């Protein structure tokens, strides 16, 4: 039976980079691996993929294949029907020379191939777990900052056994099953042959040691749960969803390792008066028709206190004014953001006779015609006042 083109087998072109060839191989090797794919023909496709990869990932073999085709690599591919022998070089699937071959099988079988991924020494010092704490604060506290106390529960080193987990005067002993490594080797029979896989020791639970006489305070854990009260400084300018890290305020470490960290996530309550986007504050200020037309100086609230705002004559409704430096403190810099004030021209729902008279005089003076109408503003105003 004619052999397929190796480039077609991997689904790459002749100009494919080494990285593209590796990616294609990893994908197909996982897809057709006999332990994962039990469909008819998967085993043959798996052999074909490996044969193509062994040639194309090797620069010398690839050059010979590109020049002479199959004749240039016959007898070199190493997959001449030897089956699924062992992985020590006796069978056709030796992991030697296959860049990320061991990684692929490591994904499938854990640490079975070439020792797998490195394991942490179970007796070495290990940093404790980090903790999260959500703090809800008022809008103005986020702007100005504050100090406040929080109480939470964390694990701490047992004061009785100093974290060993053993009763005072005794010590943990080395596990006789894993010899202190925390892992044991399990042998599996697969279509690829006998595979040795490392897994957590079922006697010591991966600790590498056994406690024969547990501490009565922590019951062998080496840690106790304890409530902790801390003073937290809320930074001025903190925003909703942002967090700060308090080093060493998390869970206790193992084997004398350092404590983890505490991350405080802030939830900021909304304000009825202000709206915030980053370091910019938004607010509204009501003004009368006369103030908009004639201009005025008004007092507006900012997050830092009231300030004067000059309204120029002829100000239109919904005009925005910027108050520089009246926004949120910049948490990672200096100075403040700005505040943008939108003026809202308030039209009175009811007016007295004198106000009506004044408006009529205003219209008579030519202040009413804004756009052509069948009736001018004065006529319509008269109709309105006369109830027509």
Curated annotation (Swiss-Prot):
Pfam families: DnaJ (PF00226), DnaJ_C (PF01556), DnaJ_CXXCXGXG (PF00684). Zn(2+) 2 binds at residues 175, 178, 201, 204. Zn(2+) 1 binds at residues 158, 161, 215, 218. A zinc finger (CR-type) spans 145-227. Residues 5-69 form the J domain. Its cofactor is Zn(2+). Its main location: cytoplasm. GO terms for biological process: chaperone cofactor-dependent protein refolding; DNA replication; protein refolding; response to heat. The keyword Cytoplasm applies. Keywords: Chaperone, Cytoplasm, DNA replication, Metal-binding, Repeat, Stress response, Zinc, Zinc-finger. It is found in: Cytoplasm. One of its GO terms (cellular component) is cytoplasm. GO terms for molecular function: ATP binding; heat shock protein binding; unfolded protein binding; zinc ion binding. Binds 2 Zn(2+) ions per monomer. CXXCXGXG motif repeats lie at residues 158-165, 175-182, 201-208, 215-222. The keyword ATP-binding does not apply. SUPFAM superfamilies: Chaperone J-domain (SSF46565), DnaJ/Hsp40 cysteine-rich domain (SSF57938), HSP40/DnaJ peptide-binding domain (SSF49493). Homodimer. Belongs to the DnaJ family. NCBIfam families: DnaJ_bact (TIGR02349), PRK10767.1 (NF008035), PRK14276.1 (NF010869). Participates actively in the response to hyperosmotic and heat shock by preventing the aggregation of stress-denatured proteins and by disaggregating proteins, also in an autonomous, DnaK-independent fashion. Unfolded proteins bind initially to DnaJ; upon interaction with the DnaJ-bound protein, DnaK hydrolyzes its bound ATP, resulting in the formation of a stable complex. GrpE releases ADP from DnaK; ATP binding to DnaK triggers the release of the substrate protein, thus completing the reaction cycle. The J domain is necessary and sufficient to stimulate DnaK ATPase activity. Zinc center 1 plays an important role in the autonomous, DnaK-independent chaperone activity of DnaJ. Zinc center 2 is essential for interaction with DnaK and for DnaJ activity. This is Chaperone protein DnaJ. The gene is dnaJ.
